[in-house]
Amino acid sequence: MFAKKTTLIIPTRNRPYFLLKLLKNLKNFKIKFKEIIIIDSSNKEIKIKINNIIKNFNCKIYHSKPSTSLQRNIGLKNKDKRSKYVMFLDDDIIFKKNSFLNLNNKIVFHEKNKSKILGYGFNQNKKTKKNLLENIKKSKISKVFGLYSKKDGIVMSSGWQTKILNIRDDTLTEWIPTGAVVFPSKVLNIKFDENFGKYSYLEDLDFSLNLRKKNYMNKFLIVANAVFFHPNDIERINFNFGLIEILNRFLIVRKYKLNIFYFFYMSFIKCLMTLFMSLRNIKNITKFFGNIIGILLCLKKLIFY
């Protein structure tokens, strides 16, 4: 099993219940790692609870300022250098039975055949709803201009990426979510970009693009029957998130020299969708203003920097 040769890195913040549930989930499936590293950025009173939880599990713990990117970097810095693999997990993941075995079989197969795979992702299963943005993404104009794609895990020139959810067959992708992923240690010659802020929105997209840039291998593999669930997937509808979802994507577009015009087109559509959503939930209006300010700040950076 690959896990015995793997350093597991879990960033967490103020969620002792979910962390405990995850660790119990792994223990129940008898998944044993070479080492487990917890990087905790919780408030003082919650840190005590986290420390009490990990006493019952064989974990190392480090403390950090709140930032998913920073926390993962601390994990990378302190991992056992002999680990053949590194696995990143969000603290609220729940795995389906045999998911690790199924992923292990794919790793063994592709390494035996010397496939050029950068990383192996578990398959998130989630109920989804169609919305205005999804319909626009699939429109003819979006397809004609290459703004979006019906394929899973594609990074478009607009800076938007297609989702990776409910995959039916093993799928090669251009980016990979870092919520439940395994990388061979030999390809991890980069760090997570800490400029993505406290929440680190889109850090996984940036990390994927950077990995592809620095390595000769340029694809990731999502394993269809290696299933996990993300029960605490919260919809974020505040001003700050509306702001960073525009600014962080702009950072990626500039960093990897993607299409600025297509980025602004999709940002404008995203803004309209947020406004439309506020008709059903007035709380979305703060996110809408965040989108607007984000677009204006991007224009300012484009003109003056």
Where are these regions (language model features)?
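A short, conserved alpha-helix in the catalytic core of glycosyltransferases
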Residues: 174-182, 187-190, 195-225
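A recurrent flexible, glycine/aromatic-enriched loop bordering the glycosyltransferase active site
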Residues: 150-156, 161-183
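Short, well-formed alpha-helical segments that are part of the catalytic scaffolds
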Residues: 15-28
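A conserved acidic beta->alpha catalytic loop
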Residues: 25, 38-50, 93
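Active-site nucleotide-sugar/metal-binding loop of Leloir-type enzymes
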Residues: 70-85
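Conserved donor NDP-sugar-binding/catalytic core segment of glycosyltransferases
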Residues: 98-149
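Short beta-strand-to-loop acidic/aromatic patch adjacent to the donor-nucleotide binding site
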Residues: 83-94
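Non-catalytic, C-terminal membrane-associated alpha-helical segments of glycosyltransferases
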Residues: 240-250, 254, 259-305
